[in-house]
Amino acid sequence: MYIVITRTFPPDVGGMQNLMWGLSNELSKHHMIKVFAEYHDNHKNFDNDCSFSIERVGGIKIFRKYRKANLINEFIKENKIEGVIADHWKSLELIKTTKKKICLIHSKEINHPVGTNLNKRALGVLNNVDYVISNSLYTKKLAISCGVNEKKIIIINPGVNPIKKLDKQTLKKSEELLKNKYPRLITVSRYDKRKNHEKIIMTLRNLKQIYPNIVYICVGYGDEEENIKKLANELNLQNQIMFFKDISNNLKNALVAKSNIFVMPSIIHKSSVEGFGIAYTEAA
């Protein structure tokens, strides 16, 4: 049996959630697994449809970390475990086991100045696991520069689930939403400084003069949502930008299919970097 420890898992939405779901689902086809994940209000129906066991841990964040670790440590003591796979070094920080440990790295969570407390904590975990799975060569080089043992790092690019054939009704709905709009630009991602929605909106102000029917479709949610909408209003681009949130995967995929260009000019913002832009792969 393998244990999967994650802080991001469906039915919550996002790239990391999709990644951890895909990893767990595929692993369950070859091994018995148990997933320890964060509590989500709508988790019951999702969990009941899964072919593997999922244990949800809720409560106040600062206490949840310790409660989750205690549950996992007890489970390891009482069961025959082959190994532990974690989405983040923090997920392994309090786990006590001599079994095989594998930790994924993505970039942002390890990008701390050498010698700082966070850097030392990350290295304390990553240099004591069996394998560090890097999502890209960029992330591997970043990890090495931060002090991670190069010999432990293996690069495995994240995969995506094949998209099912889109139904005609959803495609028709997306076409109606975008009627008479051209060209059609789209970004599917969290509203985060790193994703650089602001740059696209600033560019849109100039493109509007050349393409009066241009539209920019934003699908996602996040901390920067209000700032992005405020900028759109300040530049009088309400008619050129469409915001979508909490929509079905079918509609999201249909909007991508009916768009002309997928745009996401990511930048480095403080310690936040794009280790592997899985959104580009999903769009392709």
Language-model features, listed with the residues they occupy:
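Conserved donor-binding/catalytic core segment of Leloir-type glycosyltransferases
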Residues: 133, 177-195, 201-204, 208, ...
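Nucleotide-activated donor-binding/catalytic signature segment of Leloir-type glycosyltransferases, i.e.
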Residues: 182, 217-219, 226-247, 251, ...
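Carbohydrate-associated surface elements
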Residues: 138, 159
